[in-house]
């Protein structure tokens, strides 16, 4: 009976935690979710004029352009707003068939891809004659701009602009690199409007100075029926295009390669992207400088100021820009969950891949699964929340490559030089006896610490330690059943660092085991491994999460600000940790680990190999 009661209490804690996190993470703050699309009424006004220019975008191959929207409205109000629609035709003719509910078909059935209040221009309320600037990316369809009055809950459609379109709306765009399953393999995934019956996708690539060669690409997509619920199946749905992945194999270590995306059309012509470059991975254990960026919960921003609501993702562009600025000193990036915060509005995935393209096209962009990618009731996720907006993992698992055995089970291991990364999936059960637990132990157990001394554990939710406000109120300082399930593995296999997102701030613990600091140093750790350092690095972009007023001894550094972590391995014995502010790029927290192979082998707290007294 006591055991049953214990299980029930654990489950209660789990689901109460999920509810708390839904509130704390601002579920529903997705800007597009504020628009009550189905309540739109037609109120066309012939005196309202809208003109968008230029009408042809990307004539020189660009995938991003600025559009000027000239507005003339003789009766401006503070509730007027512009919706940007793509495809440009957005009336009831595009409505998804439904079996019931509404007495009549609504005039609009799909969300805009972005929106902006007209009074964001200071002169709008004075004259109603202004020009707004919108940044438009290539999303495989034409674009129109619509003026609405009466706010976003019961919008009145007053007028629609002329359409604008990219010269080639189907062009290959937004390449994103990822490590393959072997160290000498790089994968390239990109988006286009070409299905395989229209064009054959491939990568043309070469080491600098050598002849180019081609590697074929596979093609995937998904449809509305792939979504698990609304808004992803309803107003948030937008055709995602096609996703192509090519595997570049047998790469030389640490060599620069040039590549471009290609599609051979059925008419015999070829569509090309511009040229990109990357540097291949070092050989596992190679002694060279290796630099890693880690952050979570970045989301996306709009450089034109649109889609601003409730300060939802205020740090996203700063983090992106700082990483781009430092890109020559970065080798690989880990974005550990809550990628876009699209929450069922599919257009946001294109906008996210466009935002991170300068990073992801140059260095491997490795991802983890978060609640905003995966969680939906009765779909196999560990949490019964609705944070994915009905996406249930499909866009993340399809649009990005990661070297998992089963893409629906978002856990994987990957090696980069002197690093071994074990990436867990906190949205699936990780407890002892589960398939994922066995993966985690295997990942930790199979690394050769002689050649790869730096062992890193990654998960989205905080399976270790955090003094975030809601964890503090629960008294757990963690995701329920997190460290209780995994700490003996971290200790046994001597995990150097464990990283988490989900909580939108920065926090670092002492080297810790069973909630006790096992080392009193703060900025330099040397000698025998004693315990794992746990780091929350979920402050990359989404609105910040407050800390608890309780500060346990194990919490060494906290920062209520946006930032990211950089790891620099100089050799097999030296690792530099830096936490940088997204706003300035300045280092706010840092420490060094100095550890030789014998220090990893040495016996310490619950991580001793059996011995015998026999001679």
UniProtKB/Swiss-Prot annotation:
Query: Which UniProt keywords are given for this protein, alphabetically ordered?
Result: Glycoprotein, Iron, Metal-binding, Secreted, Signal, Zinc
Tissue specificity, per the record, is: Specifically expressed in flowers.
- Positions of Zn(2+) binding: 338, 371, 460, 502
Q: Where does Fe cation bind?
A: 297, 338, 341, 504
The residues the entry assigns to the signal sequence are 1-26
- Principal localization reads secreted
How does the cofactor attach, per the note?
Binds 1 Fe cation per subunit.
What's the domain of life for this entry?
A: Eukaryota
- Name the positions where substrate binds: 371, 502-504
Localisation: Secreted
Per the record, GO CC terms?
Answer: extracellular region
Q: Which GO terms describe its molecular function?
A: acid phosphatase activity; metal ion binding
The cofactors it requires, by name, are:
Fe cation; Zn(2+)
Question: Where are the glycosylation sites?
Answer: 129, 267, 275, 318, 592
The annotated subunit structure for this chain is: Homodimer.
Similarity remark: Belongs to the metallophosphoesterase superfamily. Purple acid phosphatase family.
Question: What's the protein called, per UniProt?
Answer: Probable inactive purple acid phosphatase 24
Can you name the source organism? Arabidopsis thaliana (Mouse-ear cress)
Q: Which gene encodes it?
A: PAP24
